[in-house]
Amino acid sequence: MSGIDPKSFGKVAVLLGGASAEREVSLNSGRLVLQGLRDAGVDAYAFDPAERPLAALKDEGFVRAFNALHGGYGENGQIQGALDFYGIRYTGSGVLGSALGLDKFRTKLVWQQLGIPTPPFEAVLRGDDYAARAQGIVAKLGLPLFVKPASEGSSVAVIKVKTADALVPALEEAVKFDKIVVVEKSIEGGGEYTACIAGDLDLPIIRIVPAGEFYDYHAKYIANDTQYMIPCGIAAEEEARLKKLARQAFDVLGCTDWGRADFMLDGEGNAYFLEVNTAPGMTDHSLPPKAARAVGISYQELVVKVLALTLKD
């Protein structure tokens, strides 16, 4: 495996499950990661923090963790802080990058300040006068819009709003998941894309063409009719520029090692970054394995390469 001795990893916990709205996705990701690591000869074991205390990791001699948790405390810096406390190396971003990366509202504030293009948006707080806010938002941003809880992943509770009358019900639904809701102008005309990041690997950008309105939870993890275009149809020079911009969007949030940066193109080819993902899904529907396969890297090789990023100083 690329010159890496699987014994160099020591005893590895694959963190999976957890207690967020994305538990089932995490279980699916984690089981595949576990199988891939074991097939490569890594001494790896499943560990569900919703069922066992994290202190057991230290007590049972784990020295490294592959974080396959999605959303909630698995992705918002809490697990990362606990692993730092116990001295256990782990995949993905640290506390700051994880916390910022899961928070769409604060991500967009950082990007705006640093000139990373992102769709125009407004933030709505739980308890606001939704009717008054909706009227002002439609007047300012127009339609269609996307309504997103600030800190849920896998497109949980993301709603596309096409009419002014639909915005208030969408806000009422989204605030069930988070006290801050992002209402974002929908970027139309050029499609949805993702740039996968894994150390220094040069992975291709993927164009995502869902059968439905947008790349929602169903399209990501259930449907078989979502199309993934590799190559993505962007000219090589422009794709290289967008990869560099995606890496910058990832880095300025304090994110490290591996993840994804998702963006839209408008009808003129301008990119608008939507969010990053610091603990991407690793199911058979997920994007990083697809990008890796396109350049000849198997699932097993990918999970070992990601885990190997924990060996660096």
Curated annotation (Swiss-Prot):
For the ligand (ATP), the binding residues are: 138-193
Q: What region holds the ATP-grasp domain?
A: 108-308
Uppermost EC category: ligase
Required cofactors, per record?
A: Mg(2+); Mn(2+)
- Reactions that this protein is recorded to catalyse: 2 D-alanine + ATP = D-alanyl-D-alanine + ADP + phosphate + H(+)
Pathway(s) the chain acts in:
Cell wall biogenesis; peptidoglycan biosynthesis
Which InterPro entries does the UniProt entry name for this protein? ATP-grasp, ATP_grasp_subdomain_1, D-Ala_lig_Van_CS, D_ala_D_ala, Dala_Dala_lig_C, Dala_Dala_lig_N, PreATP-grasp_dom_sf
The protein's location, in the record's own words, is: Cytoplasm
Please provide one cellular component term from the Gene Ontology annotations of this protein. cytosol
Which family is it part of? Answer: Belongs to the D-alanine--D-alanine ligase family.
Question: What is the protein's name according to its record?
Answer: D-alanine--D-alanine ligase
